[in-house]
Amino acid sequence: MNLHEYQAKQLFARYGLPAPVGYACTTPREAEEAASKIGAGPWVVKCQVHAGGRGKAGGVKVVNSKEDIRAFAENWLGKRLVTYQTDANGQPVNQILVEAATDIAKELYLGAVVDRSSRRVVFMASTEGGVEIEKVAEETPHLIHKVALDPLTGPMPYQGRELAFKLGLEGKLVQQFTKIFMGLATIFLERDLALIEINPLVITKQGDLICLDGKLGADGNALFRQPDLREMRDQSQEDPRAAQAAQWELNYVALDGNIGCMVNGAGLAMGTMDIVKLHGGEPANFLDVGGGATKERVTEAFKIILSDDKVKAVLVNIFGGIVRCDLIADGIIGAVAEVGVNVPVVVRLEGNNAELGAKKLADSGLNIIAAKGLTDAAQQVVAAVEGK
């Protein structure tokens, strides 16, 4: 679950980290009033969406008058911002962040993720702030400096100083950087985050460090113990189908194709999409129904897949390990009958009671195509889409 920039900065403030004074506004009038609270300009106005690349898309602007603030808010509030990180529809702009402009002398980067290879939280710092860190990692990886947090000791001040020295910081900037490093690490661990990022972390012309931007991603599996983060969730920024799937403990990611995929297991789901692509098809989604593929969850999965108007056929690929294929077949039959599926449905069952499951599908009288294997399933669903 991602947070908006203004929400990230609210958390920064709670932990004593420096950030520009700013206010999130939902109307042009609020935006003008926010400028008055901040004081004399210039100000920076930013569209609040869960996506990067806002500046290049016109969603961030430095303004010198309250009239310009009102015009920016009137132009963007209620609209959708399209960036290189969004789809063609973009993300809805429901809030504008108005904050004091900062005199920037230099831009840095500081962020942290959970590194699965080392099984630790790893902090990354770079002198190349203000640009996508992925681009820096690809083109100039030697400019990214890393430290890993020991799970027993947690973050240590010497690690912050080590990064500061590698960034070429001196004097009071080393102390300020270390404080920010320790604060970010504390936020990361106490708030069960999966990602935290300040890009850019700037050195002002006055010689101080300030968190000019903030990006936080919470671990969805830990939200049950982070009630204040749950309250910050903005479902308008999420795919409504993904949000509906999450309510049923289904993992759904929308794609651009026309073949709906329903699979149990993330690895099998990715393999299914690969083989569909291999045989000339285009997956419309990733959908993992998990180990407990009950009739109710299968029914809901069909509803979610078919809510995408692009879907011309559905491929159901189930391996019966934890669950029995005959019970899955009952769920598929009941779901197809209840939902009223009007597109071809190809089903491949393997594993526990697969033969009995295939027989139930064949005897159902419904328009369900039973596949003999994964390759056959991919070929049949692609042929069904092409009308062959």
From Swiss-Prot:
Cofactor: Mg(2+)
Source organism, top-level taxon: Bacteria
Keyword ATP-binding: yes
Reaction equations catalysed: succinate + ATP + CoA = succinyl-CoA + ADP + phosphate; GTP + succinate + CoA = succinyl-CoA + GDP + phosphate
Binding positions (Mg(2+)): 199, 213
Keyword Transcription: no
Function: Succinyl-CoA synthetase functions in the citric acid cycle (TCA), coupling the hydrolysis of succinyl-CoA to the synthesis of either ATP or GTP and thus represents the only step of substrate-level phosphorylation in the TCA. The beta subunit provides nucleotide specificity of the enzyme and binds the substrate succinate, while the binding sites for coenzyme A and phosphate are found in the alpha subunit.
Name by which UniProt lists this protein: Succinate--CoA ligase [ADP-forming] subunit beta
Species of the source: Shigella flexneri serotype 5b (strain 8401)
